[in-house]
């Protein structure tokens, strides 16, 4: 009788652990954004610093995955990439619909307004000259990036 109770408890804890693990499982990203910013001359590092110190955390708080932030190592005139003034990053979401929802929430965040919007609206403190956005979908088995639900 004792072994039946212990077996039942063991099975119960095993199932509970499995379900908890499933609930914690990360879901694959289904939608990415490639963002390419041209910074004001001499302001690229300040822009990168703003992302590192504030903006990335705001995005993460709203469920946006900060996939990566990049500084080009060479210029490419055909692509409009300047090694001195270009800042590139990739964000990830479960879907385009989730992107729209999460990005709106991040942009409506009072901290975002204080840190980014206010600075970019003032011509004397603006860091970004122009921004390009390219929507991307995973292709093939090689996109091994996951984000939290």
Q: Where do the model's predicted regions map?
A:
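Bacterial N-terminal signal peptides that target proteins for export
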Residues: 1-9
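An amphipathic, aromatic/His-enriched active-site/gating alpha helix that lines ligand/cofactor pockets
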Residues: 26-27, 50-67, 83-84, 92-134
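Extended non-catalytic domains of envelope/secretory-pathway proteins
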Residues: 37, 42-47, 54
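Intrinsic, low-complexity N-terminal interaction/targeting segments
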Residues: 66, 71-74
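Acidic/histidine-enriched, glycine/proline-rich intrinsically disordered or flexible terminal extensions
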Residues: 137-149
């Amino acid at each position: 009788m004792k072994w039946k109770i212990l077996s039942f408890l063991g099975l119960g804890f095993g199932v509970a652990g499995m379900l908890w693990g499933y609930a914690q499982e990360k879901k694959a990203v289904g939608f990415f954004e490639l963002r390419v910013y041209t910074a004001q001359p001499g302001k690229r590092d300040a822009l990168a610093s703003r992302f590192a110190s504030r903006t990335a955390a705001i995005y993460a708080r709203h469920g946006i995955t900060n996939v990566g932030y990049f500084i080009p190592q060479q210029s490419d005139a055909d692509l409009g990439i300047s090694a001195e003034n270009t800042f590139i990053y990739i964000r990830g979401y479960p879907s385009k619909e989730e992107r729209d929802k999460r990005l709106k929430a991040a942009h409506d965040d009072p901290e975002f307004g204080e840190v980014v919007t206010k600075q970019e609206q003032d011509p004397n403190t603006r860091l970004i000259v122009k921004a390009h956005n390219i929507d991307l979908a995973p292709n093939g088995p090689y996109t091994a990036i996951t984000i939290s639900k």
